[in-house]
Amino acid sequence: MKFTLVATVLLTFSLSAFAVEYPVLTTASPDQVGFDSQKLHRLDGWIQNQIDAGYPSINLLVIKDNHIVLQKAWGYAKKYDGSTLLAHPIRATTNTMYDLASNTKMYATNFALQKLVYEGKIDVNDLVSKYIPGVKDMPGDKIKGKDKLRIIDILHHVAGFPADPQYPNKNVAGKLFSQSKSTTLEMIKKTPLEYQPGSKHIYSDVDYMILGFIIESITAMPLDRYVETTIYKPLGLKHTVFNPLMKGFTPPQIAATELHGNTRDGVIHFPNIRTNTLWGQVHDEKAWYSMGGVSGHAGLFSDTHDMAVLMQVMLNGGGYGNVKLFDDKTVAQFTRRSPEDATFGLGWRVNGNASMTPTFGVLASPQTYGHTGWTGTLTSIDPVNHMAIVILGNRPHSPVANPKVNPNVFVSGLLPAATYGWIVDQIYGSLK
């Protein structure tokens, strides 16, 4: 008995001695980690000029060498109620939560997949039909290939699916119309391929809707519950959730988006469309109407500090503090350039050529990766410079520039702030 007890103690001590302790974020002055503070401070005036010109708000956080060196908010979380400018707009703070839009794909869906791959619960070369049996070729399909679709094809956006079938808009979706999650899965199975899988690259929301369903199939949990309980909670994240208004948050904590629901200032109509200013609900139509606010492609809300922790997990090679989600091999696997398109890894956008300059600027290393979100969000992770940048914004919280010409271009989208690369370059240009 004594021998067993001693052996157990020694084994416990041995395991604890080899336990991985990952770096955690601390605060440092820019000068301490190689920035010229005076140059970096110039960014303050440039961003404020964009706010004065009409950009709703920008929240910015910069990480360098495991330190937060800049965290600041500019502008307004809510300045409009419909078309009316508020007499007392709500200022954005560094705690303001934002609709991440397509950054959901990385910090919910990809994080979940990276964890499941590391745990051996899924292989990216598995067939999609292993987890969603109904994804298969049908006799009347003009383009076939669903039978052989692999998860890696979905992640590389070469699976053949259209970019945006607009399931909740019956006028566009036709027979694929859906405004319920269970029906949406069936409509995805029926969605025709637009091209032969592997023959070209089309960035598709459908791909990540499918990945969300696959995660739910493997974990037997809703996507939001899985990521919130197994990823965000262990990391100590307090403001990273789907459907925040259902989880204890209030509108004043969140940045508002489109002024007139999803109508693009009154030119788009479909059953159940929202018409009031969106405030605390996901903007994305498929995520809200077709998926109940929780989807693999959109729906996540967060603030800059929580996003900084998630980016630091990637810089650390898969963990934070005493929490390990995956390993450095998994990070390398998911951020490796796709053979079909050098600007994509497994889901991650990669700084693979000059086409990514509007996103990552001209000064970030070629190994930089991250993602953007339609609402005005950017994450940029540079493992060479051990640096990361998160920009959160609410770009659609402004009038549509010309609804009849292009309902998807907002006044704020015409400003330089809508192109993240110039902000990224100002930050890199401040390095000594």
Swiss-Prot record:
Catalyses which reaction(s): Preferential cleavage: (Ac)2-L-Lys-D-Ala-|-D-Ala. Also transpeptidation of peptidyl-alanyl moieties that are N-acyl substituents of D-alanine
Gene Ontology biological process terms in this record: proteolysis
Domain of life of the native organism: Bacteria
Enzyme class: hydrolase
Enzyme Commission (EC) number: 3.4.16.4
Topology in membrane: Single-pass membrane protein
Main location: membrane
Gene3D superfamilies the UniProt entry points to: DD-peptidase/beta-lactamase superfamily (3.40.710.10)
Name of the protein described by the UniProt record: Putative D-alanyl-D-alanine carboxypeptidase
